[in-house]
Amino acid sequence: MGLNLLPIEMDDIRKRLDREPNEIEWRVIDAVWSEHCSYKSSKIFLKSFSIDSPNVIMGIKDWQDAGAVDIGDGWAIVIKVESHNHPSAIDPFNGAATGVGGIIRDIISKGAKPIALMDMIRVGNLKIRKNVWLLKNIIAGIAAYGNSIGVPVVGGELSFDDTYNDNPLVDVAAIGIVRKDKIKPSIVDKAGLKLVLAGLTGIDGLGGASFASRKLSGEDEIGAVQIADPFAGKIILDVTLEIADKVEAIKDLGGGGLAVAVTEMANGLGAIVDIEKIPLRVKNMDPADVIISETQERMLYAVEEKNVEEVCKAFEEYEYPCSVIGEITSEPIIKFRYFGKDLVSLPTNALLEPPKFLWPIKNVRKNVEEKNVDLSLESTIYTVLSHPDLVSKEWVYSQFDYEVNTSTVVKPGDANGAVVSLPNGKLLAIKADGNPDLCSEDAYECGKGIVAEAYRNLATVGARGMVAVDHLQFGDPKKPEVYYTFVEAIRGIGEATRFFNIPIVGGKVSFYNENSQGKPIKPTPLIVMAGLVQGKLLKNRVEDSSYVVLLGYTRKELGGSLLSKIFKVPSQAPKVRLQEDLLSSEVVIDAINEEKITFAKDISRGGLAASLFNIIVHGYGVEISTKSILSDTDNVVENLFSESSGRFVILTNEPEWIVEKSRSKGIVASIIGKVNKKTSILTIDNTDYDLKTIVNNYFNFLEEVIGNG
């Protein structure tokens, strides 16, 4: 049968049922109990993310398709992050496109209108042609769906590492807006409701949930990849929002198809589904395939009988299939029938309560012997600043219609965070952050660090973080060293979100990200954070003669840094000091509201040097004195490329105000230099470094490698 269940799980369900499941029931159990759908190896830890917050309307405790947070004036935002890693490794265009479609349906399942998308892409070394092909088609898939459906892609991440050569990561986040009294659940609380299905069911995506719950084994798994249809997705979006008031619950058909959607929607009640009533894309489909098909652009609605005709009529206007396929029952049994014959009859609670697993762990935290960095400053500057992680992503953004719906306030690449306008007149900033290199060194500090970095990035546009979702991407959880990094990352994320009082309202866990030889990816947890602009919005601009102020203390902490990755420098990973991140962020927000700064950039990937380079690419030069850097090392390379947290580079015409404001908050700040008109010149301690070639690489690298690939 090709099941992905463990023997202990198969024995467990036999004992609960007191019988042997039939072949179709085994396939249903395999889907519902898959790691992808059940979180059986992670759910016990995810509960630690729960924070009681008066703003949370729908959070991690509710365990629904997306989270929702009150933003005032009767409005709420809905937020979700998802991935389509395994499908994108096999069919990158459809894998990425269906990832966009799926997360949009998660947002509209809450009755919310999607207003923004973000994509976070990680692929392997671009010297390998397959990775260029993967990236080009991943971007094309995201663009094709997002542009066609009319939801702007407002930002994201793009990074490269050999660890993703066979297993790219394709994450998509979405934000929606809804009146808070109009939010829809994905679950029901009463029997008698009719189950209405919109969309055709085909043979694509068969076994997708199980496919996503094991390591990749080859391109013969192409049948598990769903096919995208953005124009059908647009109909689903528009009609779902139109009929939201007429339905009791809305559920996207994602992983596991109807088997999972019906079971989860029933919420402890039962359901009867008549398979012959399901509209099919392919004639004479096997009923078992109909149950677990993951064909896209389908939605399931729980509807009062009196409203069924009106709901289906709305779809009929678009000639879109809509059918009553069953109903919610009081008996807690999930039944799939075919012309009156029960093919599946399983207790709801048995399906919703799979065995939970706590796998062995093995401490892999590294104890590193510190050594003095002995590198040529000139070659280090040129090598690090030329790294693909630091180049402009404008070629990628240019593929997306990021201004559709005219709500985008800060364009992709113009700041550290994306900003969109909301119906209540407020501005919402959004940012995603991950750091797999740091996570491979110290997953606990990395967990704290990615939360802190997202918080700092929002501060650079004048926003304060208020809500987050997470995506945890790891290898096989049964491997002790993998499970250890997973548990440690959760510990760090939980500690940081509690410190900042930012509730995680949802997320995703993606295990089994390994190549065909069983080598896991670097641990890659991801945080997507959103927050409201607190007063004034900062749109970065660079002006001649502005003072360069370094906010925060620099430490010799090179572990997990880009410098360490390139030059194999042994060093301890940075210790994330959350209090410093909070206080330095408050200084930046205050300075923005007082109109004291024109430019703000948090210091992260590539260290101080990369942040200064971000000024230079605006067509200016920068001169600094490393002796002015407040630090625990005199080594110039260490000061320029350390990735200690809690730091910002800001441009101002009132540097003393910044220094005094920082002092009043308990944070150090120093005036380290000035902006000048020496285009593309970085001057360090009176020595000029001509970065014209690096600047040209910054603007043209992706187009030359991918656009012509």
Swiss-Prot record:
Q: What class of enzyme is it?
A: ligase
**Residues that, per the record, bind substrate:** 83-86, 105, 226, 294-296, 510
The keyword Cell cycle is assigned to this record: no
Q: In which pathway does it act?
A: Purine metabolism; IMP biosynthesis via de novo pathway; 5-amino-1-(5-phospho-D-ribosyl)imidazole from N(2)-formyl-N(1)-(5-phospho-D-ribosyl)glycinamide: step 1/2
Keyword Cell inner membrane in annotation: no
Its Enzyme Commission number(s) read: 6.3.5.3
Binding of Mg(2+) 2, residues = 106, 252
Q: In the UniProt record, which is one GO cellular component term?
A: cytoplasm
Query: By its UniProt entry, which Gene3D superfamilies does this protein fall under?
Result: PurM-like C-terminal domain (3.90.650.10), PurM-like, N-terminal domain (3.30.1330.10)
- Residues annotated as the enzyme's active site: 36, 84 (proton acceptor)
- Cell compartments where the protein resides: Cytoplasm
Q: Which UniProt keywords apply?
A: ATP-binding, Cytoplasm, Ligase, Magnesium, Metal-binding, Nucleotide-binding, Purine biosynthesis
**Positions bound to Mg(2+) 1:** 82
Catalytic reaction(s) noted: N(2)-formyl-N(1)-(5-phospho-beta-D-ribosyl)glycinamide + L-glutamine + ATP + H2O = 2-formamido-N(1)-(5-O-phospho-beta-D-ribosyl)acetamidine + L-glutamate + ADP + phosphate + H(+)
Identify the residues that bind ATP: 39, 80, 470, 507
**Could you give a GO molecular-function term held by this entry?**
ATP binding
Q: Which family does it belong to?
A: Belongs to the FGAMS family.
Classification via PANTHER family = PHOSPHORIBOSYLFORMYLGLYCINAMIDINE SYNTHASE SUBUNIT PURL
Q: What does this protein do?
A: Part of the phosphoribosylformylglycinamidine synthase complex involved in the purines biosynthetic pathway. Catalyzes the ATP-dependent conversion of formylglycinamide ribonucleotide (FGAR) and glutamine to yield formylglycinamidine ribonucleotide (FGAM) and glutamate. The FGAM synthase complex is composed of three subunits. PurQ produces an ammonia molecule by converting glutamine to glutamate. PurL transfers the ammonia molecule to FGAR to form FGAM in an ATP-dependent manner.
Summary of subunit composition and partner proteins: Monomer. Part of the FGAM synthase complex composed of 1 PurL, 1 PurQ and 2 PurS subunits.
Output this protein's name.
Phosphoribosylformylglycinamidine synthase subunit PurL
What species is this protein from? Saccharolobus islandicus (strain L.S.2.15 / Lassen #1) (Sulfolobus islandicus)
